[in-house]
Swiss-Prot record:
Positions that bind xanthine: D99, I142
Binding site for 5-phospho-alpha-D-ribose 1-diphosphate: R43, G44, D95, D96, L97, V98, D99, T100, G101, G102, T103
Chain residues that bind guanine: D99, I142
Keyword Iron-sulfur annotated: no
Record: residues binding GMP: D99, T100, G101, G102, T103, W141, I142
An example Gene Ontology biological process: purine ribonucleoside salvage
Phylogenetic placement of the source organism: Bacteria, Pseudomonadati, Thermodesulfobacteriota, Desulfovibrionia, Desulfovibrionales
Protein name in the entry: Xanthine-guanine phosphoribosyltransferase
Gene: gpt
Topology within the bilayer: Peripheral membrane protein
Organism: Nitratidesulfovibrio vulgaris (strain DP4)
Length: 163
């Protein structure tokens, strides 16, 4: 399935909104802790993990590095670039988003005892995470602030109509 077919909508997230949503996630996670530390899924989970680490006063932050996207195309293969030891007991895994669940499934297999939280969740991946804040439809591309910049956009009325 091509990107054009898969993503029919774009959901832009600002730095302020991401911070607000990550803090809201922290409120939900507060009652489920305490945690030994955070395992951030790089790269998308790094910024939310920093906010959550501050809010939960967690000083130990590890990373697991998995490559699955090439721009807007999600690849079918996941490349594990860095992992962590253990089964995840007492640890909090943080990612920005669970989409199709490919990355989440792989991390769940590696760290089955960790608590898995994401800021945003799509229906296909939602069952793989324990806690999330905002659900977004499967056909929506979430445009994170680290992937965008402020620029002029043509008003909707002047844009070509999509079927």
């Amino acid at each position: 399935m091509s990107t054009a077919d898969r993503y029919r909508k774009v959901f832009p997230v600002t730095w302020e909104q991401l911070h607000r949503d990550a803090k809201a996630l922290s409120w939900r996670l507060l009652e489920k802790g305490p945690y030994k530390g955070i395992i951030a899924i790089a790269r998308g989970g790094l910024v939310p993990a920093a906010v959550i680490a501050r809010e939960l006063d967690i000083h130990l932050v590890e990373t697991i590095c998995i490559s699955s996207y090439q721009w807007q195309e999600q690849t079918s293969s996941h490349k594990v670039l860095k992992t962590v030891e253990g089964r995840g007991e007492g640890w909090l895994i943080i990612d920005d988003l669970v989409d199709t669940g490919g990355t989440a499934r792989l991390v769940r297999e590696m760290l089955p005892e960790a608590h898995f939280a994401t800021v945003y969740a799509k229906p296909a991946g939602r069952p793989l995470v324990d806690t999330f804040i905002t659900e977004v439809s499967q056909d929506t591309w979430i445009l994170f602030p680290w992937d965008s910049e402020v620029q002029y956009v043509v008003p909707l009325v002047n844009q070509p109509q999509q079927s």
